[in-house]
Design a protein with these regions (language model features):
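Alpha-helical segment proximal to the catalytic Tyr-Lys
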Residues: 71, 115-119, 176
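Active-site loop-to-helix junction immediately N-terminal to the catalytic Tyr of the SDR YXXXK motif
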Residues: 46, 92-100, 112
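The beta1-alpha1 cofactor-binding region of Rossmann-like NAD(H)/NADP(H)-dependent oxidoreductases
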Residues: 5-16, 48, 161-162
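Residue(s) in the substrate-gating loop at a strand-loop-helix junction
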Residues: 86
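Active-site helix of classical SDR
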Residues: 66, 102, 110
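C-terminal helical subdomain
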Residues: 126, 150-174, 178, 185-187
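Substrate-binding pocket helix/loop in short-chain dehydrogenase/reductase
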Residues: 42-43, 50-55, 137, 148
Length: 190
């Protein structure tokens, strides 16, 4: 096991992390881009800093790590890159213009990158979770969570393990012909 603390929004730091992983293990088979924050407010109240913070962590970090990892994976002629998007990146949500833009940007990045690296046997996919029980959702008031659940046909929020199982599938050879796709894990929200 190797633990490395790093700023995912820092281009050079991402390359250093990938280099350290390759030095330690000899190669890089799987990259999961899962950094994410929110700074929710209506667009007319949103500061430039709130916009930049979310785009840097949620989208720029994916670019940084994909840039670093794809170079190594091209040499290996194999690899799986999985980026965490969101139902909000697919459908939008009031008060989350920055978050929606960052998560929609991930979808575009995944679709384009999959076409760039597919000939080298590198798969690039995204997962778009719906409302998942996390620290982010647990901090919401009970009334907000109750309203969220009403919008989910399965009448419950998802569990982090349910998203992790999809990531495991996408990282494995069971998905050897799956690339450029966005897999929704959202209880039939859309």
């Amino acid at each position: 096991m190797l633990c490395i603390k790093s700023n995912a929004a820092d281009f050079q730091a991402a390359h250093q992390v990938v280099n350290q992983v390759v030095e330690a293990f000899g190669k890089l088979d799987i990259l999961v881009c899962n950094a994410g924050i929110t700074r929710d407010t209506l667009l007319m109240r949103m500061s430039e800093q709130q916009w930049d913070d979310v785009l840097n962590v949620n989208l720029k970090s994916v670019f940084n790590y994909c840039h670093a990892a794809s170079t190594q994976m091209m040499r290996q002629r194999s690899g799986s890159i999985i980026a965490m998007s969101s139902i909000v990146g697919v459908a939008g949500n009031a008060g989350q213009v920055n978050y929606a833009a960052s998560k929609a940007g991930i979808i575009g990045l995944v679709k384009a990158l999959s076409k760039e690296v597919g000939s080298r046997n590198i798969r690039v996919t995204a997962i778009a979770p719906g409302y998942i029980l996390t620290d982010m959702t647990s901090s919401l008031p009970d009334t907000v969570r109750e309203e969220m659940v009403k919008t989910i046909p399965m009448h419950r929020c998802g569990e982090a393990e349910e998203v992790a199982k999809v990531a495991l599938f996408l990282a494995s050879d069971l998905s050897s012909y799956v690339s450029g796709q966005v897999i929704s894990v959202n209880g039939a929200m859309g």
